[in-house]
């Protein structure tokens, strides 16, 4: 159990660090946009990776890596709490249209990306 917890912690540190670096990179590339582009992109990418890993792990017998990859790396990488904060911040600024768009895109595209990740992984395996 302790080894699993340490694997989750290590994965979380890796995922969170990647999320931070992507956020900084997006900010440097686009400047302050007033729209949470970095968090949106991370959540979509993370969902696609989660979908792909679920399928690959099941077919390749890698489910033992799930705590490290899914709970740790991808759990630290994607961020529902940051999503919630960004949505409320947009609402508080009075940017109701942007808030609704952000919520819709985050949910819709992340779910679609997860499904695409699963389909891509299945395509690789067959």
From Swiss-Prot:
Positions bound to Na(+): 75, 78
Catalysed reaction equations from the record: fluoride(in) = fluoride(out)
GO aspect biological process, one term: cellular detoxification of fluoride
Membrane topology category: Multi-pass membrane protein
Localization (cell): Cell inner membrane
Keyword match Lipoprotein: no
Keyword Transmembrane helix carried by entry: yes
Chief place where the protein resides: membrane
Notes on activation and inhibition: Na(+) is not transported, but it plays an essential structural role and its presence is essential for fluoride channel function.
Disulfide-bonded cysteines: none
InterPro entries: FluC
Keywords noted in UniProt: Cell inner membrane, Cell membrane, Ion channel, Ion transport, Membrane, Metal-binding, Sodium, Transmembrane, Transmembrane helix, Transport
Pfam families (alphabetical): CRCB (PF02537)
Source organism superkingdom: Bacteria
MF terms (GO), sorted A to Z: fluoride channel activity; metal ion binding
Transmembrane segments: 2-22, 37-57, 65-85, 99-119
Coiled coil: none
GO cellular component, one term: plasma membrane
Function according to Swiss-Prot or TrEMBL: Fluoride-specific ion channel. Important for reducing fluoride concentration in the cell, thus reducing its toxicity.
UniProt family annotation: Belongs to the fluoride channel Fluc/FEX (TC 1.A.43) family.
Name of the featured protein: Fluoride-specific ion channel FluC
Name of the encoding gene: fluC
